[in-house]
Amino acid sequence: MAERIPAVTVKTDGRKRRWHQHKVERRNELVDGTIEAIRRHGRFLSMDEIAAEIGVSKTVLYRYFVDKNDLTTAVMMRFTQTTLIPNMIAALSADMDGFELTREIIRVYVETVAAQPEPYRFVMANSSASKSKVIADSERIIARMLAVMLRRRMQEAGMDTGGVEPWAYLIVGGVQLATHSWMSDPRMSSDELIDYLTMLSWSALCGIVEAGGSLEKFREQPHPSPIVPAWGQV
């Protein structure tokens, strides 16, 4: 005979689930309000100022967030989940040729971050371990998606795919760090940054294709220094 679960237990579990869902939704509302407040007034807002902008007391904020570090981490996580990752999925799924796709992936990352300068700087000014983990997790997700795309395209071309993961991490990590440096000190336009990063990434990908993705072929090839053109000479 099957064991009957007491009705009171079922009701309690249902209440717990509803309360948990309410807390998640309310927390997301507060994070969204924080992001809007930072967009309007800049990254130096205090918890008191954030609470006032959202229209709640600071006590309410601390009911959902341990401290400002916790709120900062939640802002980064929300931005990653609702904006960055969806934008990167769309870019990686674009039906484009190699060069155009390479530039599109880089463009989407740079412009997604550049579109949120104050929230980005608000997050990056925080040095908590939890924030660093969120950033590392987002990079890992994007790198794995890039690796899947590279592997598929290389397999279709009959190339060796053994290096797709380190290549993907190199591209994602390099673009992220270069974009962060540019956001901190933008000494060129976003288009120039995108094209410089595309120049390096595309040149690297061309080298990989020339070796068929094969480490053995790459090792066997001669690697002379490139001949530097005499630019400007008639």
From Swiss-Prot:
InterPro entries assigned: Homeodomain-like_sf, HTH-type_TetR-like_transc_reg, HTH_TetR, Tet_transcr_reg_TetR-rel_C_sf, TetR_C_32
Keywords from the UniProt entry: DNA-binding, Transcription, Transcription regulation
Biological process per Gene Ontology, one example term: regulation of DNA-templated transcription
GO CC annotations on file: extracellular region
Domain HTH tetR-type: 24-83
GO molecular function, a single term: transcription cis-regulatory region binding
DNA-binding region range list: 46-65
UniProt entry tagged with the keyword DNA-binding: yes
SUPFAM superfamilies named among the record's database cross-references: Homeodomain-like, Tetracyclin repressor-like, C-terminal domain
Record's miscellaneous remark: Was identified as a high-confidence drug target.
PANTHER family reported in the protein's UniProt record: HTH-TYPE TRANSCRIPTIONAL REGULATOR RUTR, TRANSCRIPTIONAL REGULATORY PROTEIN (PROBABLY ASNC-FAMILY)-RELATED
Protein's UniProt name: Uncharacterized HTH-type transcriptional regulator Rv0472c
Species of provenance: Mycobacterium tuberculosis (strain ATCC 25618 / H37Rv)
